[in-house]
Regions:
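Intrinsically disordered, low-complexity protein-interaction/activation regions
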Residues: 1-121, 127-128, 145-152, 158-160, ...
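Terminal recognition/anchoring or ligand-binding modules at protein termini
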Residues: 123, 140
């Protein structure tokens, strides 16, 4: 407890120099109070998720720019954070899943892969994201990488669920895409 107090005291001294940020103690909780002049991308993202404000393509691009900077509280695992992290991850996956199909694999394969990767970061066994990523990789003629992504996904699926992923690579990949594969 004293280590926490020392850390907060140091934090307060640093933040004293910034007029727009304050550390408050209220009802046995520390609160970081930001003035309206302060922009915090994390809080902006949280507001967008709570209000379900990601409705248009420009909204999505702004939202994606924020979340693509990294996983929320990466590496932190405290019981009191679990519900919060789960809310952020699930809400983020919902938004990403809603918008991924607005991008054409033929015209924007790289963007589809980026969005699929972001979904898989938040939900490592998301089958929809796997399908989008594999389709985009095959469209780019990255057959070996598509197979590698599939194999990694299957290993993780086996580890998480204790059973094999139910679909083979050939079942996952639409036949017209497989016929594009050049002989090796």
């Amino acid at each position: 407890k004293s280590l926490r107090s020392v850390s907060i005291l140091k934090l307060r001294k640093i933040l004293e120099r910034i007029d727009t940020v304050e550390v408050l103690f209220n009802a046995n909780r520390y609160i970081l109070q930001l003035s309206e002049d302060v922009y915090c991308d994390y809080l902006a993202c949280l507001d967008w998720l709570k209000d379900k404000r990601v409705r248009t393509q420009p909204d999505f691009e702004y939202f994606y720019d924020i979340i693509s900077k990294g996983e929320v509280f990466k590496g932190e695992s405290f019981d009191w954070m679990d519900d919060f992290k789960s809310y952020i991850c699930n809400s983020t996956v919902d938004v990403l899943s809603r918008f991924i199909d607005t991008y054409s694999i033929e015209d924007e394969a790289d963007r589809v892969i980026q969005i699929a990767d972001q979904i898989l970061l938040n939900d490592p066994c998301n089958e929809e994201a796997l399908l989008y990523k594999i389709k985009a990789l095959i469209y780019q003629n990255n057959f070996k990488l598509a197979r590698y992504v599939y194999d990694r996904f299957c290993a993780l699926y086996q580890e998480m669920y204790g059973e094999a992923f139910p679909s083979s690579f050939e079942q996952v990949v639409p036949s017209p895409l497989m016929s594009q594969q050049s002989p090796q």
